[in-house]
Amino acid sequence: GLGDVYKRQVNRFLGYQSKAKGAVDKQVYALWNILQKRKFRYSSVSNTSLSSNVVFSQRVRTFDDALESSQINCVDGSVLFASLLRAINIDPILVRTPGHMFVGYYTDNSHTDKNFLETTMIGDVDLDDFFPDEQLDSTMVGKSQNEMSLLTFEKSKQYANKKYKENEEGIHSGKLNYMFLEISKDVRRKIQPIGK
């Protein structure tokens, strides 16, 4: 199960204890890399990774389900990643916009800075779908698995941070189909994982 994934890794994680610049991002990338090595694929009802009509009635699968099937959608992926962040004492944020969900995290203890991630990019994706102008797929030739993992992590941040900025007003408006949920330790206690 998922426990083993980060029991092995968790000793390396310090949450916000390290004052080194970028320390939190490095830890988040380590999680990203672990999940990528487990060959996550992205699943969406409509088979397009950027579909605006992803239905939110999909049952959020339990983590072991998601890990075993390696099929993940934006809701599963965001909730899974948020739980992993919480487990290593980094404060996650779940963000919802109409038809989509992504995850964020505070890069420091005082919550002055945050980054966001497009978790669907953990899987086998065509980066050209996300960045049509950059022809990224051609830059991937000959890159190692770790180089690719880092590239998709950085691109995922770039993409989600942009989406956050574009939708910031809505996200904080409390309007239907928008959400900004900080998952503090207290919230985590209230959220019961959905059983099988």
Name each model-derived stretch.
Residues 9, 34, 66, 139, ...:
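Residues that form generic nucleotide/phosphate-binding pockets
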Residues 151-196:
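Low-complexity, Gly/Ser/Thr/Pro-rich intrinsically disordered linker/tail segments
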Residues 24, 37-39, 43-102, 106:
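Active-site neighborhood of thiol-dependent amide/isopeptide-bond enzymes
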Residues 16-22, 26, 81, 88, ...:
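Mixed-charge, low-complexity segments
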Residues 75-168:
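Hydrophobic/aromatic-rich core segments of domains that either
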Residues 1-6:
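Short, small-residue-biased leader/transition segments that mark boundaries at the very start
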Residues 19-20, 69-70, 120, 155:
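A generic structural signal for short
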